[in-house]
Amino acid sequence: MAVVARVVLNGITKEQYDAVREETGWLKEPPVGGLSHMTWWEGEDCHNADAWESEEAFNAFGAERLGPAMAKLGIQAELQVTFHPAHEVYLPQPVTLTV
C-alpha cells in the first residue's frame, strides 16, 4: 500500500541536505519504491513530504543509503517520521527542481 511519509530533521542546514543528496545519489539513482519527494524549511528544521510504495521501501532506503550517507558526512539529525496511508498519488510529469 502506498504511503505518505512526513519527515522532520531538526537543525539540518540546506548545505547538509545538499551534501546528503549528493552522497546518496538519489537524483541519479532514485530509491527503490520512492514515488515523490518535496522539501522545505521552517526555521531551522528541514521538512519532507514523500510518497512511497510502502513503509518497507522507505525504511530500506533509510537503512541502506540515507543513514550511511548521514553518518559518513557526520550529520547527526534524528528523523521524526509519520506515515499515512495514501488515498491517491498523482504525478502528472516527472520533474526535478533544485535550488
Give the positions of each predicted feature.
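Short S/T/G/P-rich N-terminal loop/turn motif that feeds into the first structured element of a domain
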Residues: 1-49, 53-67, 74-99
